[in-house]
């Protein structure tokens, strides 16, 4: 289900096309918004964008993991992770027209997994 990847440049171009700011102003605007979101998350704040979703930071405690190659137990340090929770409106919009058709590659992967029992 991999689609096109949208980059910062694409976002800046969209602002330029739809808002009417210059390309320089559009780029500065996008960078400012992304910096503000980043700064809030670094401070541990939740960023809630109505009708879109929320970005939040969760604290994960130390735990014991396992090295997949050797099977030996290894400690995993406590850390903070960023989580995105989409809003119900965004979920509805994404699923409004049913599931997107799978790419050929994804279809082949699912077929191979089904055949192998996994």
From Swiss-Prot:
GO terms for biological process: DNA recombination; positive regulation of metabolic process; regulation of DNA-templated transcription; regulation of translation. It comes from the Bacteria. This protein is one of the two subunits of integration host factor, a specific DNA-binding protein that functions in genetic recombination as well as in transcriptional and translational control. The keyword Amino-acid biosynthesis does not apply. The keyword Transcription applies. Keywords: DNA recombination, DNA-binding, Transcription, Transcription regulation, Translation regulation. Disulfide bonds: none annotated. Belongs to the bacterial histone-like protein family. This is Integration host factor subunit alpha. One of its GO terms (cellular component) is cytosol. Heterodimer of an alpha and a beta chain. It comes from Rhodopseudomonas palustris (strain TIE-1). GO terms for molecular function: DNA binding; structural constituent of chromatin. Residues 97-118 are annotated as: Disordered. SMART domains: BHL. PROSITE patterns: HISTONE_LIKE.
């Amino acid at each position: 289900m991999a689609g096109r990847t949208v980059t910062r440049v694409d976002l800046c171009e969209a602002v330029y096309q739809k808002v009417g700011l210059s390309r320089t102003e559009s780029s500065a605007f996008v960078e400012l918004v992304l910096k503000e979101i980043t700064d809030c998350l670094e401070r541990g704040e939740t960023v809630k964008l109505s009708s879109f979703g929320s970005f939040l930071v969760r604290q994960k405690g130390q735990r014991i993991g396992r090295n997949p190659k050797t099977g030996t137990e290894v400690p995993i340090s406590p850390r903070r992770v960023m989580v995105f929770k989409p809003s119900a409106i965004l979920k509805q919009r994404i699923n409004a027209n049913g599931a997107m058709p799978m790419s050929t590659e994804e279809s082949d992967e699912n077929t191979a997994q089904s055949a192998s029992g996994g």
